[in-house]
């Protein structure tokens, strides 16, 4: 078992895993994820495969249509995590343990700086070493100093950070979900239209109410921003949280995040003879802008002289344009105004707001992992330096001082500059 862990702790093995994961993520970025089989058959046909090999059968066989949730990708992440753990225990911890020891030696090997001198200023040299931040230990006539032990400990936290990121990714793949909802103003809804989910996903039964929806426009009638006011409702029907969301300003409640994504018109509410009714609209586009069309009957369907008017809506400002049967603009009507002979009154635009709901149980692991990774990576670049001093007493009160120094980051020690005047 120990041999297996030593293989897992091998740097080449970890690099190979990272390469495989990188290639897999590249495929996940190129191939659209979580689409229907018909979509892949249409875009990745058997004839003329992309790159000479990529067809819908290959995608389906290797589960490339949901890479981040399939078993072999999660196995790669787990293998990398185990490799990092093995490397930490078999390589990092022994190195830290060795660095904490007082390693006294008269002639250490592979040093970056070495000199011998006859001097009576050994005490001054030792004080200089201490002033440089070294911890100095003495054993008879030998001195040993270390500095920057945090630089040897930091790689352990780098590994821990990456493991946290891997765990967060696995939790997100197994337990996260994504939902798209189109909800009318004033309605209460639950999460239903799930577009993607993991095998261990548990859908929240949280109730949400859309209190209001509105749009801000630029002077040229281009949409500036659209907003939805949402309320979180508890089991007793009480509001526990409320926030107005917009694009890039979501509502976060527990493990749910609500994003503003889209909007649409469903119809118009009209009043006729003190009775309200609704007429649906049909969406189309004009110059890449949304336009809605509908037809308002002005007589009953049983009338022989059935007539009506065409209504066009091109924004959410509360304005409609009425055209006659010849396609000529008849009038422009605002909300709460009468459409025809004070018999038909425009009451309300019936709109829906598009809400994307995400749950990611691994997001905190990923955030903390990246935070630790940034800090520990910076700390890992701190040099771990060692210095050895050996004192030999000569005749006539002279002292022979042997100085050796070593560092793991740079070949030029700042300490050598400080002790240069004594050499």
Swiss-Prot record:
Signal peptide: none annotated. It holds the Pfam family ResB. Keywords: Chloroplast, Cytochrome c-type biogenesis, Membrane, Plastid, Thylakoid, Transmembrane, Transmembrane helix. It comes from the Eukaryota. One of its GO terms (cellular component) is chloroplast thylakoid membrane. It is found in: Plastid, Chloroplast thylakoid membrane. One of its GO terms (biological process) is cytochrome complex assembly. It is a multi-pass membrane protein. Its main location: plastid. The chain crosses the membrane at residues 11-31, 70-90, 153-173. The keyword Ligase does not apply. Belongs to the Ccs1/CcsB family. Required during biogenesis of c-type cytochromes (cytochrome c6 and cytochrome f) at the step of heme attachment. May interact with CcsA. HAMAP family: CytC_Ccs1. This is Cytochrome c biogenesis protein Ccs1. It comes from Heterosigma akashiwo (strain NIES-293 / 8280G21-1). The gene is ccs1.
């Amino acid at each position: 078992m120990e041999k297996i862990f030593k293989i897992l702790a091998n740097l080449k093995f970890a690099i190979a895993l990272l390469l495989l994961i990188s290639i897999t993520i590249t495929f996940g970025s190129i191939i659209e994820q979580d689409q229907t089989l018909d979509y892949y058959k249409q875009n990745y046909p058997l004839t003329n495969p992309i790159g000479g090999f990529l067809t819908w059968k290959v995608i389906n066989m290797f589960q490339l249509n949901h890479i981040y949730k399939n078993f072999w990708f999660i196995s790669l992440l787990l293998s990398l995590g185990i490799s990092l753990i093995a490397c930490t225990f078999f390589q990092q911890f022994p190195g830290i343990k060795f660095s904490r020891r007082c390693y006294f030696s008269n002639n250490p090997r592979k040093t970056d700086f070495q000199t011998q001198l006859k001097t009576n200023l050994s005490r001054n040299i030792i004080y200089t070493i201490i002033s440089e931040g070294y911890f100095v230990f003495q054993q008879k006539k030998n001195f040993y100093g270390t500095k920057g032990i945090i630089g040897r400990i930091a790689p352990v936290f780098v590994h821990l950070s990456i493991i946290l990121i891997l765990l967060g990714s696995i939790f997100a793949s197994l337990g996260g979900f994504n939902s798209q909802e189109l909800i009318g103003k004033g309605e209460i809804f639950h999460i239903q239209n799930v577009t993607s989910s993991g095998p261990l996903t548990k859908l929240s039964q949280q109730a949400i109410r859309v209190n209001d929806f509105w749009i801000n426009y630029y002077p040229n009638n281009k949409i500036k921003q659209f907003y939805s006011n949402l309320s979180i409702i508890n089991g007793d029907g009480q509001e526990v949280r409320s926030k107005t969301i917009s694009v890039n300003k979501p509502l976060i409640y527990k493990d749910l995040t609500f994003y503003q994504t889209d909007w649409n018109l469903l119809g118009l509410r009209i009043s006729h003879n003190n009775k309200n009714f609704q007429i649906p609209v049909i969406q189309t586009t004009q110059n890449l802008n949304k336009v809605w069309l509908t037809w308002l009957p002005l007589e009953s369907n049983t009338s022989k002289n059935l007539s009506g008017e065409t209504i066009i809506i091109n924004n959410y400002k509360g304005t409609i344009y009425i055209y006659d049967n010849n396609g000529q603009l008849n009038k422009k009507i605002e909300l709460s105004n009468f459409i025809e002979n004070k018999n038909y009154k425009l009451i309300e635009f019936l709109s829906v707001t598009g809400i994307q709901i995400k749950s990611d149980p691994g997001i905190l692991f990923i955030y903390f992992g990246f935070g630790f990774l940034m800090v520990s990576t910076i700390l890992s670049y701190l040099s771990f330096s060692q210095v050895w001093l050996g004192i030999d007493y000569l005749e006539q009160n002279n002292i022979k001082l042997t100085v050796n120094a070593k560092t793991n980051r740079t070949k030029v020690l700042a300490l050598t500059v400080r002790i240069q005047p004594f050499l």
